[in-house]
């Protein structure tokens, strides 16, 4: 189920949204710009450390963050469906970005929950089940959403999808919090130091690539 609710939001802001904007006669150049709303999926590493550092509810570290992201995700999907692209495209962009942000956040926590709640021998099966559910979720939002939109309105389709996402909330409430001991990290240890290490490694790798490239270009060739 967690894989399903992870895959479902993805195509709501890609395939289904593009079809909706096209039907509303939004220009192709504007629709192309909407590809930028997918950035949170690529940049989610920026706020992922916060989910390890802070506990926000009695549900526990993982379930607390998961429930919060799911509630905001469902709300974003619902209100996106109530927006009107032909009148206020800005609202559509903001709500679409909210969907991708909270969807990416949900993915972070679900991945951590899966790794911590399964034994080492169960990780492969767990990952396979997650991917299978993810594909079914994407199929439901993509093909299923387009079929429903052809019969009903896009607003109703997004409302239906937001209601389906409640399955994730129910699963979160019924699931058990992983029994994992967490070391308490400072803000510097959990966020600043990883970034510092990342950019240090990136700089070193980049320097090595430049050095190798320079050496390769300046080596004499034998004729």
Describe the function of each predicted region:
Residues 1-37:
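Helix-loop boundary and gating motifs at the non-cytosolic
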Residues 71-85:
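C-terminal ends and interior cores of transmembrane alpha-helices
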Residues 89-106:
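Hydrophobic core of transmembrane alpha-helices in multi-pass small-molecule transporters
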Residues 158-173:
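Symmetry-related core transmembrane helices of the 12-TM Major Facilitator Superfamily/SLC fold
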Residues 215-221:
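Conserved small/polar residues in nucleotide/adenosyl-binding loops
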């Amino acid at each position: 189920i967690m894989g399903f609710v992870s895959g479902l939001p993805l195509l709501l802001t890609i395939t289904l949204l593009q079809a909706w904007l096209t039907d509303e006669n939004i220009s192709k150049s504007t629709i192309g710009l909407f590809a930028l709303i997918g950035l949170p999926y690529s940049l989610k590493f920026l706020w992922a450390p916060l989910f390890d550092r802070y506990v926000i509810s009695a549900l526990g570290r993982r379930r607390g963050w998961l429930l919060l992201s799911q509630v905001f995700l469902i709300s974003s999907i619902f209100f996106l469906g109530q927006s009107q692209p032909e009148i206020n495209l800005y609202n559509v962009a903001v709500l679409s970005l909210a969907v991708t942000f909270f969807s990416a956040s949900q993915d972070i926590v679900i991945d951590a929950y899966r790794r911590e709640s399964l034994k080492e021998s169960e990780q492969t099966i767990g990952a396979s089940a997650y991917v299978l559910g993810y594909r079914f979720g994407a199929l439901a939002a993509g093909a299923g959403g387009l079929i429903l939109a052809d019969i009903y309105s896009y607003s109703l389709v997004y409302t239906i999808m937001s209601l389906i996402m409640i399955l994730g909330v129910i699963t979160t409430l019924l699931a058990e919090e992983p029994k994992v001991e967490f070391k308490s990290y400072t803000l510097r240890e959990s966020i600043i130091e990883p970034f510092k290490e990342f950019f240090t490694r990136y700089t070193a790798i980049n320097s090595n690539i430049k050095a190798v490239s320079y050496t390769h270009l300046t080596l004499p060739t034998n004729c």
